[in-house]
A protein has these predicted regions:
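Conserved pre-ATP/AMP-binding loop-to-beta segment of ANL
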Residues: 2-25, 32, 47, 56-62, ...
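Conserved S/T- and glycine-rich ATP-binding loop of Class I adenylate-forming
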Residues: 20, 26-29, 51, 63, ...
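Adenylate-forming
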Residues: 33-35, 46-53, 106, 124-131, ...
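Conserved AMP-binding/adenylation subdomain of ANL enzymes
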Residues: 44-62, 72-116, 129-136
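Gly/Ser/Thr-rich phosphate-binding loop
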Residues: 59, 87, 115-119, 128-195, ...
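Active-site glycine-centered loops adjacent to acidic/histidine catalytic or metal-binding residues
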Residues: 68, 152, 176, 202, ...
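AMP-binding/adenylate-forming catalytic core of the ANL superfamily
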Residues: 110, 117, 230, 234, ...
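Conserved ATP/PPi-binding loop(s) of AMP-dependent carboxylate-activating enzymes
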Residues: 203-207, 218-253, 292
Length: 349
């Protein structure tokens, strides 16, 4: 209180649109963490635009990004974007379960009149595991809650269906990265609402051209897995470089596919142009000459009624080069032997 009483007002300082606003470090699969630079002007323009175009929020709405300010979601959608749009933003310290129970998110939504929640699929998998019938949800008034957005990892169709059935509201999977600062692909709720396809973040957001390329740098046909890349130039708000590492920026993102930004994600487009993010490019495994997506296999495992969470990795095999190895976490209250569930999912794959 004493320090606050002695504090003097600080004037606003004009800065160039291209001046750095912040540096956010993100880990790479190899080497040192990369310091993603965010500039002032493009960042503000892009975030302000997304609040209506993507998230369909208006000034005065209550917006909740259940993330951490140390992550890009926290920077973009706890701090900057909601305030630029004139929304109330919620900063929440807690978990979706255990604080005190799996109704924590519903309590916050009801108490503060949240219109739009943005969180990770893991949060809903945790809620589903602890409260599979969504009984705690029914204790709260969610009448002002309109849309759930999921991002940060691939949303498996089983989690999306569970959330849709429980909430009876749109559940929107969308996709972006620390480097981009705002969504690359989404069903834009404030523009044109496309039919939802489970497993897909829908289509590229205006400003982005997203192509799927093969190792020869050619665009692949629909349904073929390849490297997901964004055509240059990138839209406002994306990273202009890495902090004190211009050459590393070029080598990491621009060199492999000339004329494109390499996302390092793998996936495909369907015949309707919907994008499917299946895995990081280093999560595509080669089994006896066949390129297989661990994400596609995880999707099958997650569809088993007893499975709450799962993961698939590639392990070395003397005959086939690699073989998939799956890990399962069962839902609370499951009585079946884990060996029986394992046999089920092997047959499903």
């Amino acid at each position: 209180d004493e320090a606050e009483a002695k504090a003097a007002p600080a004037d606003c300082v004009p800065v160039a649109a291209t001046d750095p606003l912040y540096i956010l470090y993100t880990s790479g699969t190899t080497g040192q963490p990369k310091g993603v630079v965010r500039d002032n002007g493009g960042h503000a323009v892009a975030l302000k635009w997304t609040m209506k175009a993507v998230y369909d929020t208006d000034p005065g709405d209550v917006y909740w990004a259940a993330s951490d300010v140390g992550w890009v979601v926290g920077h973009s959608y706890i701090v900057y974007a909601p305030l630029l749009q004139g929304c109330t933003t919620i900063l929440y310290e807690g978990k979706p379960v255990g604080t005190p129970d799996a109704g924590a998110f519903w309590r916050v939504i009801a108490d503060h009149g949240v219109k739009m929640l943005f969180t990770a699929p893991t949060a809903f998998r945790a809620i589903k595991r602890e409260d599979p019938n969504a009984e705690l949800m029914r204790k709260y008034d969610l009448s002002r809650f309109k849309i759930l957005f999921l991002a940060g990892e691939r949303t498996d169709p089983d989690t999306l269906h569970w959330a849709e059935n429980a909430l009876k509201r749109p559940v929107i999977d969308h996709w972006w990265q620390t480097e981009t600062g705002w969504p690359i692909a989404s069903n834009c709720m404030g523009l044109h609402r496309f039919p939802i396809k489970p497993g897909s973040p829908t289509k590229a957001v205006p400003g982005w051209q997203v192509d799927v390329l093969d190792d020869a740098k050619a665009i692949v046909k629909a349904g073929t897995i390849g490297s997901i890349c964004c055509k240059l130039p990138l839209p406002p708000g994306t990273l202009p470089t890495l902090w004190n590492a211009d050459q590393r920026y070029k080598d990491a993102y621009l060199a492999e596919f000339p004329g494109y930004y390499k996302t390092a994600d793998a996936g495909y487009k369907d015949e309707d142009g919907y994008l499917y993010i299946m895995a990081r490019t280093d999560d595509i495994i080669n089994v006896a000459g066949h390129r297989l997506s661990t994400g596609a296999m995880e999707e099958v495992l997650a569809s088993h009624p007893d499975v709450a969470e799962c993961a698939v990795i590639g392990v070395a095999d003397a005959l086939k080069g690699q073989v998939p190895l799956g890990f399962l976490l069962l839902k609370a209250g499951v009585k079946r032997a884990s060996e029986d569930v394992a046999r089920d999912v092997v047959q499903m794959v």
